Amino acid sequence: KPVLVDFWAQWCPYCRRIAPAFDKVGEQYADTLIAGKINYDEEPQLIQRFGIDTIPTLMLFKDGKALGSVVAPGSKAAIEAFIRETLAQ
């Protein structure tokens, strides 16, 4: 299954604002992908490895490879569009 990752931090107000939309997408797409979160402050090696410099950043992975990313998606619809467009490539 593809994996959708939300790189976020507790001190980031926008991260907290999109969290409910991310969680809903994770539930809605549970049959087709795995959704998870990586805390910016707790995983500096992963942040550096994937070149995350702005949060929230969502990344979509498949078979261990990053397929794409989006910074600060504005809504549940934007997250869904990112998933559809990225998986269609």
Enumerate the predicted regions with their spans.
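Short pre-active-site segment immediately N-terminal to redox-active cysteine/selenocysteine motifs
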Residues: 1, 8-11, 54
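Conserved helix-turn-beta segment immediately C-terminal to the redox Cys motif
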Residues: 1-2, 17-38
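Structural micro-motif
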Residues: 3, 44, 50-59
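Structural motif
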Residues: 7, 37-38, 70
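Conserved redox-active cysteine motifs that mediate thiol-disulfide chemistry
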Residues: 7-21
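Active-site loop/turn elements of alpha/beta-hydrolase fold enzymes
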Residues: 9, 40, 63
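Acidic phosphotransfer microenvironment of two-component signaling modules
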Residues: 44-45, 77
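Non-catalytic, surface beta->alpha helical segment in thiol-disulfide oxidoreductase systems
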Residues: 54, 59-89
